[in-house]
From Swiss-Prot:
<dbReference type="InterPro" id="IPR004839">
    <property type="entry name" value="Aminotransferase_I/II_large"/>
</dbReference>
<feature type="compositionally biased region" description="Polar residues">
    <location>
        <begin position="385"/>
        <end position="394"/>
    </location>
</feature>
<feature type="region of interest" description="Disordered">
    <location>
        <begin position="383"/>
        <end position="403"/>
    </location>
</feature>
<dbReference type="Pfam" id="PF00155">
    <property type="entry name" value="Aminotran_1_2"/>
</dbReference>
<dbReference type="GO" id="GO:0030170">
    <property type="term" value="F:pyridoxal phosphate binding"/>
</dbReference>
<feature type="binding site">
    <location>
        <position position="232"/>
    </location>
    <ligand>
        <name>pyridoxal 5'-phosphate</name>
    </ligand>
</feature>
<dbReference type="InterPro" id="IPR015422">
    <property type="entry name" value="PyrdxlP-dep_Trfase_small"/>
</dbReference>
<comment type="pathway">
    <text>Cofactor biosynthesis; biotin biosynthesis.</text>
</comment>
<keyword id="KW-0093">Biotin biosynthesis</keyword>
<dbReference type="InterPro" id="IPR015421">
    <property type="entry name" value="PyrdxlP-dep_Trfase_major"/>
</dbReference>
<dbReference type="InterPro" id="IPR022834">
    <property type="entry name" value="AONS_Proteobacteria"/>
</dbReference>
<feature type="binding site">
    <location>
        <position position="348"/>
    </location>
    <ligand>
        <name>substrate</name>
    </ligand>
</feature>
<feature type="binding site">
    <location>
        <begin position="109"/>
        <end position="110"/>
    </location>
    <ligand>
        <name>pyridoxal 5'-phosphate</name>
    </ligand>
</feature>
<feature type="modified residue" description="N6-(pyridoxal phosphate)lysine">
    <location>
        <position position="235"/>
    </location>
</feature>
<keyword id="KW-0663">Pyridoxal phosphate</keyword>
<dbReference type="InterPro" id="IPR001917">
    <property type="entry name" value="Aminotrans_II_pyridoxalP_BS"/>
</dbReference>
<dbReference type="GO" id="GO:0008710">
    <property type="term" value="F:8-amino-7-oxononanoate synthase activity"/>
</dbReference>
């Protein structure tokens, strides 16, 4: 059997034997609070559309205006003919809102993170990353010529011990962690990077739009200004794409050397128009963040004290189960009550820390939150009665060790 065919077959067999096979599901209306699968309706608690913009008629109209003005696509990379007034306007809005000199646009957060690390890091550099950073950051760090070390999750003492050995490093953390919903201690991390003459880059994919004054994100909430800020448009913005916010000089550097930017077709200008409108909606429609806070408090009130419940100050509400099969079983039980929650398993999270990743949006109602919590409590009780009790206590220990 040819090498690649054999390798592919072996990897697929191994993944199936582990019970970790992933599959695409065709869903309708999945950008709203109610999705449809195979003719059945479910309350959607798996979306990253935190502010409920993805299917908002105001934002849809803005994109249609952009389509009428600019047509369907950009037709070229930014440095050829793909950079329009709509792109420039979006960059300017982001800079004025978030307090940076330059914004460089990308087609995804994954490509923005990879472009950042690949273009900045050289052979003798040191990269220090939080152990729970996104796969895009970890992969870029491992493939870069720099020496990468990981510090324990949100552990500033461990970070300082590494910085004391390797000053003038690039420190990278997320603002809000996508699988745990917790926040980085940004003020302390910023202080350490200043102390050890290092740079700080923050990926705020899950904080922008949700935290801070007028939704300006995790760094604004922590009252810090990192050297580099990555924001993505696929969560609170309700769209897709990303931007790197930085100084004018770093922006010039990325324009020359960030290959994901230089050699990719620019996002459609109509999308940039819609993103500019999303910026305005995020900053002016405070009721969306207030609604999220209200729903988060209701969820915590119902689940507080239940084993597996993890309290967070963000829309991401992980419920820790432990074993992968138990997490899948409870997720399926929830579907029988018309509640759609995704079970997250290895390799996305460490073995033994499988969880339900519950996400709240401003489009949910209090009644839907109560249906979620009632259904989850019933599913856990049935799981315990059937003898397949989730290994919640052991999973906490495994998670602690993994960090």
């Amino acid at each position: 059997m040819p090498l690649f065919k054999s390798r592919i077959k072996s990897a697929l067999v191994h993944r199936r034997e582990q019970g970790l096979t992933r599959q695409l599901k065709v869903l309708e209306n999945s950008n709203g609070p109610l999705l449809t699968s195979e003719g059945s309706s479910f309350i959607n608690f798996s979306s990253n559309d935190y502010l409920g913009l993805a299917n908002d008629s105001e934002l849809v109209d803005a994109w249609q205006v952009g389509l009428s003005q600019y047509g369907a696509g950009s037709a070229a990379s930014p440095l050829v003919t793909g950079f329009s007034p709509a792109h420039r306007n979006l960059e300017t809005q982001l800079c004025e809102w978030l307090g940076f000199e330059r914004a460089i646009l990308f087609n995804s957060g994954f490509s923005a993170n990879q472009a950042l690390l690949f273009s900045l890091l050289e052979k003798d550099d040191f990269l220090l990353q939080d152990k729970l950073n996104h796969a895009s950051l970890m992969e870029a760090g491992m493939l870069s010529p720099a020496t990468m070390k990981r510090f324990k999750h949100n552990d500033t003492q461990h970070l300082e011990s590494l910085l004391s050995q390797t000053p003038q490093s690039l420190v990278v953390t997320e603002g809000v962690f996508s699988m745990d919903g917790d926040q980085a201690p940004l003020r302390q991390i910023s202080s350490l990077t200043n102390q050890y003459d290092s740079w700080l880059a923050v990926d705020d994919a899950h904080g922008i739009g949700v935290l801070g004054d007028n939704g300006a994100g995790s760094c604004n909430a922590a009252q810090i200004s990192p050297d580099i800020l990555v924001v993505t448009f696929g969560k609170a913005f309700g769209l897709s794409g990303a931007a790197i916010l930085c100084s004018s000089e770093v922006g010039d550097y990325l324009t020359q050397f960030a290959r994901h930017h230089v050699y990719s077709t620019a996002m459609p200008p109509s999308q940039a128009v819609a993103l500019s409108h999303a910026c305005q909606m995020i900053q002016t429609q405070e009721w969306r963040r207030e609604k999220l806070t209200e729903l988060g408090a209701l969820y915590a009130e119902q689940m507080n004290g239940v084993k597996g419940f993890i309290d967070t100050q963000t829309p991401i509400k992980p419920f820790l189960i432990g074993e992968a099969q138990a997490a899948l079983s409870i997720a399926e039980e929830l579907k029988r009550n018309q509640v759609w929650v995704t079970a997250i398993r290895s390799p996305t999270v460490p073995i033994g820390t499988a969880r339900l990743r519950i996400t709240l949006t401003a489009n949910h109602s209090q009644e839907q939150i109560l249906q979620l919590t009632d259904s989850l409590l019933q599913a856990i009780e049935r799981s315990n009665d059937s003898g397949s009790k989730p290994s919640i206590e052991s999973s906490f220990e495994l998670k602690k060790e993994a960090q």
